[in-house]
Amino acid sequence: MIQPQSFLNVADNSGARKLMCIRVLGGGNQSANIGNIIIAVVKDAIPNTAFKKSDIVRAVIVRTKKGIKRENGMTIRFDDNAAVVINKEGNPRGTRVFGPIARELRDQNLTKILSLAPEVV
């Protein structure tokens, strides 16, 4: 569960390393889970890349420590909170995605991120 002021790792090679959530997009929810889009600020970035500290970006949540419950009763949890930086159209800014990605992103039509992922759980 991600809320404003939550810190997230970046799970792609866009150039940002750490994000801080400043807004959860979508009707009235103050917390985000896997597949939700957030507005975030870059807190740490790799030098000489597209992002620098204090840039405002859109990102989609791909992993949370809280996890999600599936219809078959299984709960999927991850070791960290992570997001992938996206553009206005919903396409990832990076060309690679690191770590496992939850299958629930397919429900939000984020199949481009799933196709870049090394492992879909």
From Swiss-Prot:
Function, in words: Binds to 23S rRNA.
Subcellular location: Plastid, Chloroplast
Matches recorded under HAMAP family: Ribosomal_uL14
Gene Ontology BP terms: translation
Subunit-level organization: Part of the 50S ribosomal subunit.
Pfam families: Ribosomal_L14
Designated name of the protein: Large ribosomal subunit protein uL14c
Annotated Gene Ontology cellular component terms: chloroplast; cytosolic large ribosomal subunit
UniProt keyword list: Chloroplast, Plastid, Ribonucleoprotein, Ribosomal protein, RNA-binding, rRNA-binding
Family: Belongs to the universal ribosomal protein uL14 family.
One GO MF term: large ribosomal subunit rRNA binding
